[in-house]
Regions:
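N-terminal export signals
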Residues: 7-28
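A broad structural signal for short, well-ordered beta-strand segments within beta-sheet-rich domains
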Residues: 23-26, 39, 268, 456-457, ...
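Glycan-processing catalytic domains of CAZymes
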Residues: 32-415
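Acidic/polar N-terminal loop/beta-strand segments that form early-domain functional surfaces
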Residues: 11, 49-51, 137-139, 426-427, ...
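Compact beta-sheet-dominated domain cores in extracellular/mature segments
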Residues: 416-507
Length: 507
């Protein structure tokens, strides 16, 4: 298996531009939906790898799965498979690597997806940041990775049910030689049972399943069109709503797409073209809007297919993110197109550096001398949860909850102190931050609407002359604390106020 999730072919912008077809672009108002809103239509879906393991975590794979090139040895500068370094402060268990200490002097440790608390933390982040549905990636489970991947499916189900997120199985056909028979066998014998979960995604009343990799012009996906069509139709015959993770240029059958696969693509209920490695700036996003996305939507409309294009944050290590401007432009453009859903590529893809999950915000949280870039790589400070917050706002715009705007409304760092009261997830004003709160009374619901989750806050900044009275219960009940100055550490208060805030009054 390759070290990155998938092998990508460079897309030629010039070729794509030459292939644009006059008269195929549709406005959002002219793009009818093939399906009504469900668990993928009208929703923000995130691709979830869940494929990291560490020596000593108890996973059957028994190694540093996807963290290092040689899984038998801990990751180090010479044995590295990471494109970005995660912010690990929210995990209860982490594992020592062979990297030098972080810039802040702390040991360089990584999380394991095999720990249930890790998966729970990720799904809690999804809950807090408007990620409706998670697509669990499932590569060939018939080899040595199978037992660990089976365990991850169970862990994802548990987390999804705990945090109220929908999930579905997303098969990846890469390097799967006996895919035609084994994918059907795996669904029948193992994965279909997960559709009994109340949190398993349904669309049009059918359980959702995705197949990624059909039609790609790559040697490790050389499945004949007839085989691909057989598998798609088999899943549809099982009563599934089938999504196709297809090449970028599926419609024209060029570049990353093999020719002669259009019947395969049109057999899917929803099409989700891949975008990682295709754009690196706002101009690239606009090019695809003008020359690809609108034409894709028109084709999907003509064939009654739902359209779920990818949104990428950008490769952090290559400097593509533009502190969120690249990602926001895609949210803006695709909302204008009138797409039926959006697929975030990816939630936890630290290998390719295209993750939205919490990431090292500065050199203080990256191993010294590693060369791994932090979120502030272009000189703009960003909080570790910035791309989660950006995804939340992009989803709100897509759903019509905030106005359509080309101007990114999400600040890379939430300003604190002068504009209002700001609560923080961690002590010392670290981690995620809520919105700056004006004077007034805030129930649990009001705080949550401002990004302050229940029993979540660990520190607060308070403007001079302001007073905050915090309560441990909703509607200003329970234990109360009154502050008229910044509080950097709720654990030091008497009584302890850490993770206790449920409502508050600000005057």
């Amino acid at each position: 298996m390759t070290l990155t999730r998938r092998t990508f072919l460079a897309a030629s912008a010039a070729t794509a531009a030459a292939a644009s077809t006059a008269g195929t672009a549709l406005s959002a108002s002219a793009a009818p939906q093939a399906s009504p809103p469900g668990d993928v239509v009208g929703k923000i879906t995130v691709g979830y790898q869940g494929w990291f393991a560490c020596a000593g975590d108890g996973a059957p794979i028994n190694g540093w799965w996807h963290w290092s090139r040689n899984w038998g040895q801990p990751p180090s500068p010479s044995n590295n498979a990471l494109g970005s370094w995660p912010d690990v402060r929210d995990y209860s268990a982490t594992y020592q690597t062979a990297y030098a200490n972080l810039g802040n002097g702390q040991p360089a440790r990584l999380f394991s997806s095999y720990d249930q608390q890790t998966v729970n933390t990720h799904f809690q982040w999804m809950q807090q940041h408007g990620c409706d549905t998670a697509a669990l990636q499932r590569f060939n489970p018939f080899g040595g990775e199978g037992p660990t991947r089976d365990a991850m499916a169970a862990k994802v189900r548990q987390a999804a049910e705990q945090y109220g997120r929908k999930f579905y199985i997303m098969y990846d056909a890469t390097d799967w030689q006996n895919m035609q028979s084994e994918m059907k066998q795996d669904w029948t014998n193992k994965m279909r049972a997960y559709t009994a979960s109340p949190m398993y995604a349904k669309q049009n009343g059918k359980p959702v399943v995705c197949i990624w990799g059909f039609g790609f012009n790559e040697p490790n996906k050389a499945f004949p069109a007839s085989v691909c069509l057989d598998v798609v139709n088999w899943f549809k015959g099982q009563g599934c709503y089938v999504i196709g993770g297809v090449p970028t240029h599926w419609r024209r059958g060029v570049e990353d797409s093999r020719s002669g696969y259009l019947d395969v693509y049109h057999a899917f209920d929803m099409i989700s073209p891949w975008m990682v490695g295709r754009i690196q700036d706002v101009a690239g996003a606009d090019h695809y809007y003008n020359n690809v996305n609108q034409q894709d939507q028109a084709d999907c409309n003509a064939f009654g297919i739902d359209y779920q294009p990818c949104v990428i944050p950008g490769d952090l290590q290559s400097g593509h993110r533009r502190h969120g401007d690249l990602m926001w432009r895609q949210f803006y453009n695709l909302t204008r197109v009138g797409v039926q859903g959006m697929y975030i590529s990816m939630f936890d893809e630290y290998n390719e550096g295209n993750q939205i999950a919490k990431t090292a915000e500065s050199a203080a949280f990256v191993p010294s001398g590693s060369g791994i870039r932090a979120l502030d790589e272009d000189g703009t400070a960003c909080s570790s949860d910035y791309y989660l917050r950006l995804t939340n706002d992009g989803g709100r715009m897509f759903k019509g909850q905030i106005p359509l705007t080309p101007n990114r409304p999400t600040p890379p760092v939430v300003s604190a102190g002068t504009g209002g009261v700001v609560f923080f997830e961690h002590v010392d004003y670290l981690g995620a931050a809520g919105a700056a709160l004006a004077k007034g009374n805030y129930t649990r619901a009001a705080l949550q609407a401002a990004g302050v989750q229940d029993n979540w806050a660990s520190s607060v900044r308070i403007p001079a002359g302001w007073t905050v009275t915090a309560y441990s219960e909703d509607n200003f009940g329970g234990q109360a604390w009154t502050w008229n100055a910044n509080q950097p550490n709720f654990t030091t208060l008497s009584p302890n106020a850490n993770d206790q805030l449920t409502s508050c009054r600000i005057s």
